[in-house]
């Protein structure tokens, strides 16, 4: 399911709260006992303050030998000598690909993705989409990428200043529906 809002900071705060990194202003939130989560945060800067190579960096976040780690990196288009590159010199897109490999390593049944296609090139987005198509768990995400939303989401939840809009439908239908347009205008207080 995709979460939408005109306020991107609200989306990030929401994901930080449900991931346990931030306390809500009011109320509580708890996952069910069978839920295991993997979070892909919007800001990944703190994860890359090291001189480790990609394989050693990824090994910090899960168990497995070098070949196992290279397999996860390979799914995100790192191959050959690239896996020995220092993480401190990675581009924004390469860092995001590493974070996706890290998230996949957790083998969670619920993925939380805060604008996951930021910094990714088309080839990386396609590889990520293909991985998500075969994923058997729940995916909660926000994105500005129309194609990504259309491909991954089957439920739309929009957070507005006056409540939520929650619809089981494809994104293209959501953005073209006259009923939804009227509802959004009302919920945002548009004239």
Where do the PLM segments sit?
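ABC ATP-binding cassette signature C-motif
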Residues: 1-191
């Amino acid at each position: 399911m995709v979460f939408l809002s005109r306020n991107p900071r609200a989306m990030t705060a929401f994901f930080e709260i449900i991931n346990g990194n931030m306390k809500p202003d009011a109320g509580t939130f708890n996952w069910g006992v069978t839920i295991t989560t993997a979070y892909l945060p919007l800001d990944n800067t703190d994860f890359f303050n090291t001189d480790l190579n990609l394989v050693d960096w990824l090994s910090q976040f899960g168990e497995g030998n070098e070949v196992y780690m290279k397999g996860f990196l390979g799914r995100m288009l790192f191959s050959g000598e690239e896996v020995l590159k220092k993480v401190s010199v990675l581009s924004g897109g390469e860092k995001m690909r590493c974070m996706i490999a890290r998230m996949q390593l957790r083998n969670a049944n619920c993925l939380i993705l805060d604008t996951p296609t930021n910094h990714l090139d088309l080839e990386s987005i396609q590889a990520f989409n293909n991985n998500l198509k075969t994923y058997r768990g729940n995916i909660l995400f926000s994105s500005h990428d129309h194609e990504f939303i259309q491909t991954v989401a089957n439920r739309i939840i929009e957070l507005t200043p006056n409540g939520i809009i929650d619809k089981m439908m494809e994104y293209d239908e959501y953005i073209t529906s006259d009923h939804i347009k009227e509802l959004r205008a009302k919920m945002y207080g548009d004239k």
